[in-house]
């Protein structure tokens, strides 16, 4: 079974996000939620727009705003 470059990119992005967030243990809960939302939004935007840069950045922006507002 062959792994497509899109799936490989998504896996690398998810692993990088998880590793980078673990290094930020002194962040406030709101900061963590914002970063997680931005990462999830970027991943979702990239998948939905077939890797479009604009879709990835838009997803990250929307996800970051949603993550920031969660639990307010």
Swiss-Prot record:
What is the protein name for this chain?
Osmotically-inducible lipoprotein B
- Its main subcellular localisation, reduced to a broad class, is membrane
Q: Where is the lipid attached (S-diacylglycerol cysteine)?
A: 24
Question: Can you list the GO cellular component terms from the UniProt entry?
Answer: outer membrane; plasma membrane
Q: What induces it?
A: By elevated osmotic pressure in the growth medium.
Chain segments annotated as transmembrane:
none
Q: Which UniProt keywords apply?
A: Cell membrane, Lipoprotein, Membrane, Palmitate, Signal
Q: Which is a Pfam family this sequence falls into?
A: Rick_17kDa_Anti
What the protein does comes down to: Provides resistance to osmotic stress. May be important for stationary-phase survival.
Its membrane topology is listed as:
Lipid-anchor
Signal sequence interval, chain numbering: 1-23
Per the record, lipidation of type N-palmitoyl cysteine is found at: 24
Entry's localization field: Cell membrane
Q: Which InterPro entries match?
A: Gly_zipper_2TM_dom
Q: List, in alphabetical order, the GO biological process terms annotated in this UniProt record.
A: response to osmotic stress
PROSITE patterns the UniProt entry points to: PROKAR_LIPOPROTEIN
């Amino acid at each position: 079974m062959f792994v497509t470059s899109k799936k490989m990119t998504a896996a690398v992005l998810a692993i990088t996000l998880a590793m980078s967030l673990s290094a930020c243990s002194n962040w406030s809960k709101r900061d963590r939620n914002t970063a997680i939302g931005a990462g999830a939004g970027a991943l979702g935007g990239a998948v939905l727009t077939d890797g479009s840069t604009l879709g990835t950045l838009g997803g990250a922006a929307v996800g970051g705003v949603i993550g920031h507002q969660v639990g307010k």
